[in-house]
Amino acid sequence: MSLYHLANALQTCFERRGTSNDLDEAITFHREALLFRPASHPDRLASLNNFAYALQTRFDQRGTSNDLDEAISLLREALFLRPIHYPLLSNLLKRLAIALRIRFDQGHLLHDITEAISLYEQLLDCPFDDPNRSWSLEHLPAALRERRALIGDHRDIVEGTVAEGQSLM
């Protein structure tokens, strides 16, 4: 069994049993497996996604900001490496947007909310029947309001109103 598959198996064990040691071991094996999957490896994207998911799960459990920071870094790399017509692009954009919003809620850093807004806007380019598109329409106005509260740009009010109107269609 490869390190990658072992990591995924331990992550599944954690999801079923809730034993934090399983999640810690899964993260250790994900980290090691990634070393054997350089940027040119065809399965690196899957490793990045699953590793980021494990770190986000541990962040949800313990609130350790380093886990969230690393998950964001991994998701950014996954977004960079993904093929042009990657079928799970909207899921990847959504996961990164969620992670950035969580980090913004903790530190109120302008670059986090701005990047999250950019990801929400990219999700608007998804097909109308993609559930992540409608999810983005629901969350974009609040993110724009939060950014406006930080920098006072009135254009965020207009964009937020337009997004809210689209979500009602």
Regions found by a protein language model. Give the residues of each.
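Long, intrinsically disordered low-complexity tandem-repeat regions enriched in serine/threonine/proline
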Residues: 1-4, 20-25, 40, 49, ...
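Short coil/turn connectors between adjacent alpha-helices in alpha-solenoid helical repeat scaffolds
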Residues: 11-24, 56-69, 101-114, 145-159
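Intrinsically disordered, low-complexity linker/propeptide segments enriched in Ser/Thr/Gly/Pro
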Residues: 2, 9, 127, 143, ...
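Hydrophobic/aromatic packing residues within the alpha-helices of TPR/SEL1-like helical repeat arrays
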Residues: 23, 30, 68, 75, ...
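Conserved alpha-helical positions within TPR/SEL1-like repeat arrays
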Residues: 1-15, 43-57, 88-105, 118, ...
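Flexible helix-coil transition and linker loops at the boundaries of alpha-helical arrays
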Residues: 17-20, 32-45, 62, 77-90, ...
